[in-house]
Amino acid sequence: MAKAPPSEPKLLLFNKPFDVLTQFNDEQGRSTLKDFIPVPGVYPAGRLDRDSEGLLLLTNDGRLQARIADPRHKLPKTYWVQVEGTPDEEQLRRLREGVTLNDGPTLPAEARLLDEPTLWERVPPVRFRKSVPTHWLELVIREGRNRQVRRMTAAVGLPTLRLVRVRIGPWSLDGLGLGEWREVPARLD
């Protein structure tokens, strides 16, 4: 029997800092969502690795969570990716066509060069080496495999240095400071 939706469904947008776990408890004492979000009964709709930053959605509505997180719904997820090296047209083409990873081929991604975005300082900062150029890409994917963006850029010879998710479907980081959250209408049209 399907569980009824909560009487007051909630959907939170959270700008997750680097080195924060996307869970509410950690026996090792690392930083978690409980350090930022005082709202009881919500849980992440999807994942964002500890070493990634940016948009994380949380909800108390299991049906909404399933629609957001389930790859069958193919909600586009937009990432700004700082990579080591200078991307060429061949590398971008490979990302756009999909790359083969150890767990199989990815779906095609939208990939483009991006001017360096204005972002908050990362703590700790990304390692800087004067002799190694870095560039930013915008990648839009419609799957959610473990560490997928990092593995895709590595597969085309562009190791990821910094990864920031800026959009999931209709929701974005617009105006949300690092470590901040806000509630939005809990629906996916």
From Swiss-Prot:
**The reaction(s) this protein catalyses:** uridine(2457) in 23S rRNA = pseudouridine(2457) in 23S rRNA
A Gene Ontology biological process term: rRNA processing
Q: Which Pfam families match?
A: PseudoU_synth_2
Tell me which EC number(s) this protein carries: 5.4.99.20
Active-site residues, record numbering mapped to chain: 49
Q: What does this protein do?
A: Responsible for synthesis of pseudouridine from uracil-2457 in 23S ribosomal RNA.
What is the protein's given name?
Ribosomal large subunit pseudouridine synthase E
